[in-house]
């Protein structure tokens, strides 16, 4: 994921894992009448950089795969990125975040199980002798399972089938930039070496990273709701293939074009539109016009939406030995992380030590 020179030949370490792919509802509303509705899976990624038992930075990314019959729509949403600042870093944060994010974007080693069928329906549809004997054995008195004869029936082995995904992908990278003192690490704002950026500096930082890892992509879009196009262009004028706007469908209803991501201002506003029963008339253009008047875009500092896309990408799926965890294990880790006081060196060091012992 990171070359040795960035890790300074072992001086820095990393934590990285992802969750097993899990079926969820589509982040974009798809009408029930749609023929060939896709299945959607979600994968959570977490990365942290360590230095001498201290956390330096962290990155959380959510990947959504919408699986159609002949292509996959892949959304990569940057959920949170944060630094700790307990010590002065000898490594540039952007030099780490760029390659890690690019790795997550390009990763195609997911093992996605076939959707589970009802176990009862599977048994009823299988009239084999083995299945009938197993049913009969279950009805026998408790004494009979202890007899050798009745235990000769081999246990039924679980057969896991994995999906074969279409080789064509459409990539969508989405980043929401908003200045904050802390995104991942509680109390880290107290630390002397944490570099807190204002909205404009944060936006420029993200654009430089994203531009470096998306060379050759079809579209690079920037939207600053509430800002005029001239103010927006100042941030992207030195990048030849960037323009003002967004990467989602321009026409139609917003609810059928704009995805709902966690802790995303677009998603929060879209949920409000749904609650107010305005989704049947809210077009995409009207949605973005009203979005500019939301409170989080009117607080004075620069808040932006970045989107990049690449169409009809031919990919090769591969097996990989990446560390995976269950959803419950992931949530347990994140809850543990959020309980740490990241202004306390001892507490942070103990957190890292406990994590290593658990592996």
From Swiss-Prot:
Knockout consequences: Leads to a decreased pathogenicity in mice and increased susceptibility to killing by macrophages in vitro.
Protein's name in the database: Histone acetyltransferase RTT109
Gene Ontology terms, MF aspect: histone H3 acetyltransferase activity; histone H3K56 acetyltransferase activity
InterPro entries for this protein: HAT_RTT109-like, Histone_AcTrfase_Rtt109/CBP, Rtt109
Main location: nucleus
Family statement: Belongs to the RTT109 family.
Residue intervals of the Rtt109-type HAT domain: 1-359
Modified residues (N6-acetyllysine): 266
SMART domains: KAT11 (SM01250)
Signal peptide: none
The entry's keywords: Acetylation, DNA damage, Nucleus, Transcription, Transcription regulation, Transferase, Virulence
GO BP, one annotated term: negative regulation of filamentous growth of a population of unicellular organisms
Chain positions recorded as acetyl-CoA binding sites: 176, 180, 195-197, 205
GO cellular component terms listed in the entry, alphabetical order: nucleus
Catalysis: reaction(s): L-lysyl-[histone] + acetyl-CoA = N(6)-acetyl-L-lysyl-[histone] + CoA + H(+)
Location(s), subcellular: Nucleus
Known EC number: 2.3.1.48
Chain's gene name: RTT109
Residue numbers annotated as active site: 264 (proton donor/acceptor)
Entry function: Histone chaperone-dependent acetylase that modifies 'Lys-56' of histone H3 (H3K56ac), to promote genomic stability, DNA repair and transcriptional regulation during mitotic S-phase. Plays an important role in the regulation of white-opaque genotoxin induced-switching.
Top-level division of the source organism's lineage: Eukaryota
